[in-house]
């Protein structure tokens, strides 16, 4: 029915019929109450069906009426010649077109952000699993992390392994390890595990096991992490014995230790002791009793390995070991340096090159300091002075071909292309 008046008349007619039908239903109910035979019961059923049918019809007609009224309003609505939406506060039209409406109903501002993760709850959850499934999940989220995240983005995935199970009434049931792979719009719970949080907590709990299995994230591999940690114990001991430029030189030879990096680190450890947070101390206690391989000195053989899988902040279990948070910052600077080198040598406009740069250091600094500790920039400078040049010389820059070999190969390519076409040969 296209006519508004026809629909209104139809509703009026059906409402009159409904009044009569309801009266007949009441009469039928009274009759059944006095004489409940089969005929009267059948009549009652028919009366009820008639009332239901009329109510449904009236409901449908009212919906039609509402649609017609809405369509009529839309048709008569005056179009703003300026192209500005009615509720837009601008007096003149913006140069930008109107885009999508972003629904924020699902966002809860009371939920903590990713920077205030409940590390104790996350650590306790990870420690409840056997080591094989944890290390296999770490491999999937570090060595094969990009592929795993790409295939499962926006979902909550479960890792399953035969080594991880629980007995329920005598039946062996798989115990899944849950990890959330959020999108940019996702809001994470304090105890929800994301790939970044997972790498952070597992690297902090099991550095010795990661070292034994040589699990290294690609972003750490390309900055030469394997070479860097090859002789880590000798490297860090030589570093701690070296003279510190930030300490005054001793007057006597017997006091030479007081001007070394080791002495600076001892002073730093005293400062760190004053910054401890109870939740992280509780996590460390839980981890020590749960079989984790923790350390309390940067000279430990596995201390550098807590960064092997590129955690996005210093793992909380090593947060209070002097020099360790700064070591992670040093690695993040190396990642930025390598990306800057790669962007510089690439072909493209200045703007395109800038897009290839990264900000790992800023992200690491912000996330680590949000855990309640300020990084000592002087320690990062010491690392850069002592190890920076060596680290840069071992970057993987995607150019492992010998220059002479490249020249010979390019000459052969140039010759062959000129033989078969008049196009300009590409560079290898």
UniProtKB/Swiss-Prot annotation:
Annotated coiled-coil positions are 4-71
Q: Where in the cell is it found?
A: Virion; Host cytoplasm, Host perinuclear region; Host Golgi apparatus, Host cis-Golgi network
Write the record's keywords in alphabetical order, separated by commas.
Chaperone, Coiled coil, Endonuclease, Host cytoplasm, Host Golgi apparatus, Hydrolase, Nuclease, Ribonucleoprotein, RNA-binding, Viral nucleoprotein, Virion
Principal location listed in the UniProt entry: virion
**Ranges for region RdRP binding:** 1-50
Instruction: Site Important for the endonuclease activity: give positions.
Output: 88, 103
Q: Which Gene3D superfamilies match?
A: 1.20.58.90
Q: For the region Chaperone activity, give the residue spans.
A: 1-100
The annotated region (Interaction with host UBE2I/UBC9) lies at 188-191
According to the record, the residues making up region (Viral panhandle binding) are 1-175
Annotated motif YxxL, positions: 178-181
Residue ranges of the region described as Homomultimerization? 1-79, 100-125, 372-420
Quote a single Gene Ontology cellular component term: host cell perinuclear region of cytoplasm
Q: Which domain of life is it from?
A: Viruses
Residue ranges spanning the membrane: these are: none
Single GO MF descriptor? endonuclease activity
| InterPro entries, sorted | Hanta_nucleocap
Q: How does it assemble?
A: Homotrimer. Homomultimer. Homomultimerizes and binds to viral genomic RNA to form the nucleocapsid. Interacts with host MAP1LC3B; this interaction participates to the protection of Gn from virus-triggered autophagy. Interacts with host SNAP29; this interaction participates to the protection of glycoprotein N from virus-triggered autophagy. Interacts (via N-terminus) with host RPS19; this interaction probably mediates the loading of the 40S ribosomal subunit on viral capped mRNA during N-mediated translation initiation. Interacts with the viral RdRp. Interacts with host SUMO1 (via N-terminus).
Know anything about its domains from the record?
A: The N-terminus is required for chaperone activity and, in trimeric form, this region likely serves in high affinity vRNA panhandle recognition. The N-terminus also contains a coiled coil region, which probably participates in but is insufficient to initiate N trimerization. The YxxL motif is indispensable for the interaction with host MAP1LC3B. The central region is involved in specific RNA-binding. Has distinct cap- and RNA-binding sites so it can bind simultaneously both the vRNA and mRNA cap.
Q: Which family does it belong to?
A: Belongs to the hantavirus nucleocapsid protein family.
Q: What does this protein do?
A: Encapsidates the genome protecting it from nucleases. The encapsidated genomic RNA is termed the nucleocapsid (NC) and serves as template for transcription and replication. The nucleocapsid has a left-handed helical structure. As a trimer, specifically binds and acts as a chaperone to unwind the panhandle structure formed by the viral RNA (vRNA) termini. Involved in the transcription and replication initiation of vRNA by mediating primer annealing. Plays a role in cap snatching by sequestering capped RNAs in P bodies for use by the viral RdRp during transcription initiation.
What is the recorded name of this protein? Nucleoprotein
**Protein source organism:** Black Creek Canal orthohantavirus (BCCV)
Give me the gene this protein comes from: N
């Amino acid at each position: 029915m296209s006519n508004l008046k026809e629909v209104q008349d139809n509703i009026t007619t059906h409402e009159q019929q409904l009044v009569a039908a309801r009266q007949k239903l009441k009469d039928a109910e009274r009759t059944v109450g006095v004489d409940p035979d089969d005929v009267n019961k059948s009549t009652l059923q028919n009366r009820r069906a008639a009332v239901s049918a009329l109510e449904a019809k009236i409901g449908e007609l009212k919906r039609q009426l509402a649609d017609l009224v809405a369509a009529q309003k839309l048709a008569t609505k005056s179009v703003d010649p300026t192209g500005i939406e009615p509720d837009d506060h601008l007096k003149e039209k913006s140069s930008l077109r109107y885009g999508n409406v972003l629904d924020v109903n699902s966002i809860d501002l009371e939920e903590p952000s990713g920077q205030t993760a409940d590390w104790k709850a996350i650590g306790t959850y990870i420690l409840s699993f056997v080591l094989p499934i944890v290390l296999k999940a770490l491999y999937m989220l570090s060595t094969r992390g990009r592929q795993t995240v790409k295939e499962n983005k926006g979902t909550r995935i479960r890792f399953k392994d035969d080594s991880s199970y629980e007995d329920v009434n005598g039946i062996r049931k798989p115990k899944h390890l849950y990890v959330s792979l959020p999108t940019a719009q996702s809001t994470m719970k304090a105890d929800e595990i994301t790939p970044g949080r997972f790498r952070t907590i597992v690297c902090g709990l099991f550095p010795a096991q990661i070292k034994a299995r040589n699990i290294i994230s690609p972003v750490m591999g390309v900055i030469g992490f394997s070479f860097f940690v090859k002789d880590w114990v000798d490297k860090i001991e030589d570093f701690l014995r070296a003279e510190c430029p930030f300490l005054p030189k001793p007057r006597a030879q017997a006091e030479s230790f007081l001007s070394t990096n080791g002495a600076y680190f001892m002073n730093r450890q005293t400062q760190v002791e004053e910054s401890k947070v109870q939740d992280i101390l509780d996590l460390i206690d839980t981890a020590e009793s749960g079989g984790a391989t923790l350390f309390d000195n940067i000279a430990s053989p596995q201390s550098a390995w807590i960064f092997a899988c590129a955690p996005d902040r210093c793992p909380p279990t090593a947060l209070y070991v002097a020099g360790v948070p700064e070591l992670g910052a040093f690695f993040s600077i190396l990642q930025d340096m390598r990306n800057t080198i790669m962007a510089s040598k690439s072909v493209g406009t200045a703007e395109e090159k800038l897009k290839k740069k990264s900000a790992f250091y800023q992200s690491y600094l912000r996330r680590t300091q949000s855990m309640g500790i300020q990084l000592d920039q002087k320690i990062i400078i010491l690392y850069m002075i002592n190890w920076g040049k060596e680290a840069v010389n071992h970057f993987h820059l995607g150019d492992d071909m010998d220059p002479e070999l490249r020249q010979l190969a390019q000459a052969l390519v140039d010759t062959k292309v000129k033989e078969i076409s008049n196009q300009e040969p590409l560079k290898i």
